[in-house]
């Protein structure tokens, strides 16, 4: 059983900007590299959650590069992918870090899991005083 995990849902088949996670921000630094490194700062078990589509095969290699876990599931049903990942890895608490969220604040993520585990809540979302994009969801 994994007590706390950071799930990074991402896929490359976006219609608005395909392969956006692979876009280079500076030199050879891809946007997904930034998100993964920020998620690792939580010290939670980090899992890249993607689809079983061939367009997402490259994400398996990226997970290996960063020494994080990979989970492959539904392409179009992100919530099912989360659920299946939670069940497969037997995760007690999960922090969702959007794969294109370069501004994710890992400290807020850590505090959200702390709040989640110290209360009877099942879901925590951002409050009005936190800019959306710095934090998404924590759930048990």
Q: Predicted segment positions?
A:
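Hydrophobic targeting segments
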Residues: 3-8, 32, 45-48
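Short, high-confidence coil segments that cap the C-terminus of an alpha-helix
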Residues: 43, 91, 118-122
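Conserved donor nucleotide-binding strand/loop of the catalytic core
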Residues: 64-77, 87
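A conserved acidic beta->alpha catalytic loop
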Residues: 51-56
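N-terminal nucleotide-binding beta1-loop-alpha1 segment
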Residues: 1-18
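Conserved core of the sugar-phosphate nucleotidyltransferase
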Residues: 61, 104-140
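A short, N-terminal amphipathic alpha-helix
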Residues: 30-46, 61, 65-66
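Short beta-strand-to-loop acidic/aromatic patch adjacent to the donor-nucleotide binding site
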Residues: 82-86, 90-102
């Amino acid at each position: 059983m994994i007590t706390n995990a950071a799930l990074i849902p991402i896929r490359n088949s976006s219609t608005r900007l395909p392969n956006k996670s692979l876009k280079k921000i500076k030199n050879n630094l891809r946007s997904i590299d930034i998100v993964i490194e920020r998620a690792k700062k939580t010290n939670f078990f980090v899992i890249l959650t993607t689809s079983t589509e061939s367009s997402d095969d490259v994400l398996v290699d990226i997970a290996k590069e960063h020494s994080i876990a990979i989970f492959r599931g539904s392409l179009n049903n992100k919530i099912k992918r989360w659920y299946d990942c939670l069940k497969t890895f037997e995760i007690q608490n999960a922090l969702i870090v959007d794969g294109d969220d370069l501004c994710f604040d890992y400290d807020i993520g850590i505090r959200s899991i702390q709040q989640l585990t110290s209360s009877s809540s099942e879901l925590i979302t951002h409050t009005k005083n936190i800019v959306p994009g710095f934090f998404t969801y924590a759930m048990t």
